[in-house]
Amino acid sequence: MKYIAKKFGSLILTLLLVSFLSFFAFSVIPGDAAKSQLGTEATPERIEALQKEMGLDRPVLERYASWVAGFFHGDLGTSYSYSMPVTDLIRDKVPITITITIIAFLMILAVSIPIGIFTAQHAGGHLDRLIMTLNQVIMSVPGFFIGILITYFFGLILKCFQPGAYVSISENFTAFVGYLVAPSAAIALPRCAMAVKMLRSSVLSQMDADYVRTAYSRGNSARRVMYHHVLKNALIPVLTFWGMTIADIVANSIILEQVFSIPGMGSLLITSISNRDYPVVQGILVLIAALVIIINFAVDLLYGRIDPRIRVKDGKEL
């Protein structure tokens, strides 16, 4: 319980730090949100009136204190552009980005684990060299370019989906998920290649260990040794990579949502930055920071589940 309480306290402190830094940065960067909303022909009187309405005439620390008070009540402020609560605005976009993240991560697991194990078991063979060569190529290609290729070949030529024909989750759930498969694949492919390379290296390093030879000497089959002994230890460093991958998927979805014309959090973030809609930008940044911290916490817990030698007690690893 102490460990969980410590992690929860760390979550709150990190979110407050992220929110303060972003709040301070938005207050010092050039430009005025009120001028951006009214346009270049607005009179000084109208700009001043809108600044007062937005609360921009108050000191930065006072505005931040008001934001923190609202944050603990689930209020992230009001959007300048949409004139609606930021929480409601983000809530409509979260399911889209979360669905892309889940699909992409499941793709990474489904592809990287079997291929990583296979290449480790056949290290130095023809298929291993071919797969690792393809890995290098895929890792060097940006996700947005893969997204463009998928749109061209699978969308325009093979007609597997219609580019730009996004269907919301409320209209048709199956079509909604189906349309998100393409951007998820574009995000997942480079990360699949990296995960395969990492898992292969981790498995190979474990296969030369003394406990593996001991397991074979006791009459265990190669399959049992791999899945009950080697893989358990090989997954520990890969877990950290997978944890970081989820945060990376969320970050890359910002670009891929533009390529596939998907109205998710990424599209909202870019639009809000362009419009200087800082409450929305800050709300999304805090949400992403919370996601990263929660994922790291989950990874810490999984360490102890996979390897009993790693124990977490009272916030300390023993």
PLM feature segments, named:
Residues 2, 94-128, 172-318:
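Alpha-helical transmembrane segments of integral membrane proteins
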Residues 11, 93, 97, 133-136, ...:
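Residue-level signal for discrete positions within transmembrane alpha-helices
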Residues 15-65, 158-179:
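Hydrophobic alpha-helical transmembrane segments of membrane transport/permease proteins
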Residues 16, 20, 136-149, 241-246:
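Hydrophobic alpha-helical membrane-insertion segments
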Residues 22, 26, 30, 34, ...:
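Membrane-water interface at transmembrane helix exits
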Residues 52-61, 76-86, 167-180, 187, ...:
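Membrane-interfacial helix-loop-helix junctions in multi-pass membrane proteins
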Residues 57-113:
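An internal, D/E-rich "acidic patch" concept
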Residues 133-197:
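Membrane-water interface segments at transmembrane-helix boundaries in multipass membrane proteins
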